[in-house]
């Protein structure tokens, strides 16, 4: 900043929610104030930092945020086309319905006090399902989630949460970079099955 006058002025920088700012004076949150010298050339440099964090959701579940981005565990799935006639309206491809079924494990819990590793990836499209721009690697514990009573393909609203195996290293990706996903997971203590 080049400043000619004799007056000092204050530059206010609002630090976005879910981030902090790092400069030569340390790390801060909220509002960042810079006081300029009376005149002359003035430079400053700072860096915005976001850290992965778990937020509590209803029903004792948690979601992973990184800055303003919500992350989810991607689930492999298969689509089955449903063509039918209802109330005289024919639903044929491409105007039919689809059911999506999981082809990979989805019953997991966050492991208390596990680290999160943010991985920046090369990408061509911001919400690419196969090559998302960011991934967060962490340990998840396989659990017995259970099904809604009377439904074979509807996950229980409140998981049982009982550990069913050893912790596994998994990568979560931005919510918008997934089709079939688990976004809210319970928390489980570190340990072995």
PLM region spans:
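Surface-exposed beta-strand/loop patches in extracellular or lumenal glycoproteins
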Residues: 2, 7-17, 60
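Short amphipathic beta-strand/extended segments with alternating polar/hydrophobic composition
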Residues: 13, 27-29, 73-75
């Amino acid at each position: 900043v080049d400043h000619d006058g004799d007056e000092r002025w204050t530059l206010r920088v609002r630090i976005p929610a879910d981030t902090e700012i790092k400069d030569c004076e340390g790390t801060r949150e909220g509002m960042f104030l810079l006081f300029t010298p009376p005149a002359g050339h003035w430079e400053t440099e700072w860096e915005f930092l976001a850290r992965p964090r778990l937020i509590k959701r209803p029903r004792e579940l948690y979601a992973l945020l990184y800055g303003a981005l919500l992350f989810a565990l991607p689930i492999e799935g298969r689509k089955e086309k449903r063509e039918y006639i209802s109330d005289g309206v024919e639903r044929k491809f491409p105007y039919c319905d689809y059911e999506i079924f999981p082809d990979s494990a989805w019953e997991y819990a966050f492991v208390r006090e596990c680290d999160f590793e943010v991985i920046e990836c090369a990408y061509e499209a911001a919400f690419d399902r196969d090559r998302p721009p960011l991934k967060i690697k962490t340990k998840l514990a396989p659990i017995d989630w259970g099904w809604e009573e009377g439904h074979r393909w509807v996950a229980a609203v409140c998981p049982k949460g009982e550990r069913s195996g050893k912790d596994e290293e998994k990568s979560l990706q931005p919510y918008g970079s997934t089709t079939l996903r688990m976004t809210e997971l319970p928390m489980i203590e570190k340990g072995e099955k």
